[in-house]
């Protein structure tokens, strides 16, 4: 009379075909590397995954990521400090005039953009320098961040002279050492 079996082309799920694909002979064999994780067999990584790992571990990618992160963090920090500052929007020529909301927002945006650019440059410089130092030394330890902090701080400080460059090197290296000590 009425058949409960549905034809294969009507779009309903056929659990027997799914089970055969997942468990049966249509299942793709997984090649294992015997010593992958301390003797535990692990599957071989496909070429796409290896390529993505190489890209994400490159110094250029790390510097770009630090640049974008520094820009966002610096912008937020700049807008926050402008919001706290009581002199935002005031005109020094006419100190008695109350600034409009448009003037205050313009000043907050300018300060946020200034902080964002500075944080982005410092973040990219430090990250790229640390990656290059780590690649050169072949080690990942606290000395990399101290050396890259000294190089970055010195490069920023040397724009103001030799003394500022030496102080920038020492200050940024010390700050990097403290941050690295607490994060590791």
Curated annotation (Swiss-Prot):
Belongs to the Tim17/Tim22/Tim23 family. Essential core component of the TIM22 complex, a complex that mediates the import and insertion of multi-pass transmembrane proteins into the mitochondrial inner membrane. In the TIM22 complex, it constitutes the voltage-activated and signal-gated channel. Forms a twin-pore translocase that uses the membrane potential as external driving force in 2 voltage-dependent steps. GO terms for cellular component: TIM22 mitochondrial import inner membrane insertion complex. GO terms for biological process: protein insertion into mitochondrial inner membrane. Its main location: mitochondrion. Disulfide bonds join 59-131, 150-169. One of its GO terms (molecular function) is mitochondrion targeting sequence binding. It is found in: Mitochondrion inner membrane. Core component of the TIM22 complex. It comes from Xenopus laevis (African clawed frog). This is Mitochondrial import inner membrane translocase subunit Tim22. The keyword Cell inner membrane does not apply. The chain crosses the membrane at residues 64-84, 115-133, 160-180. Keywords: Disulfide bond, Membrane, Mitochondrion, Mitochondrion inner membrane, Protein transport, Translocation, Transmembrane, Transmembrane helix, Transport.
